[in-house]
Amino acid sequence: MKLPLWRLLIAVTPLLTSLASAEMSTEVARAGVAPFYKALNAEFATDSADLIRQATAPDWVSCRGNDVCNSREEVIAGVAARLKSVPDLTWQIKDVLVSGNQVTVRGEATGTPAAEFFGTAPTGKSFKVMSIDVHTLEGGKMVRSYHIEDWIGAVRQVTAK
């Protein structure tokens, strides 16, 4: 017995829709972004460029505003500079949320600046701040990221009297 094409389409549409919108698991998402966050830790400073390249697509961009984005190589240079100015920097993944191919990471950065830090001289004081990052993953690699860190709060903490 042959089914009319329209009946076949009606029958398989729910299956195709569920496959197209299937979310990656939290574990897969965490594994995809983990090398990037590892790269933000002073302990892995010598490997940070390779770790960032491992986690990102060649044309990945990281945006700190709607229209202010940096290329992968610019981010690698920025991370290297940050790790020099905060030689004990640690960055932990605190929470991971997944929606389709978007991964939101709530993170926490801590460190003690040893060089100029957002225009302030080192004081010997440490900071602890939250970060929120939204990454789009394709093929297990980050292709676009939006991020917010509380750097004003960090400066307040290291300059507090």
Residue ranges and their predicted role:
Residues G111-E138:
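Exposed beta-sheet edge and beta->alpha loop/turn motif
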Residues V96-T104, T136-M142:
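A short, structured loop/turn motif at beta-sheet edges
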Residues R7-S18:
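Bacterial N-terminal signal peptides
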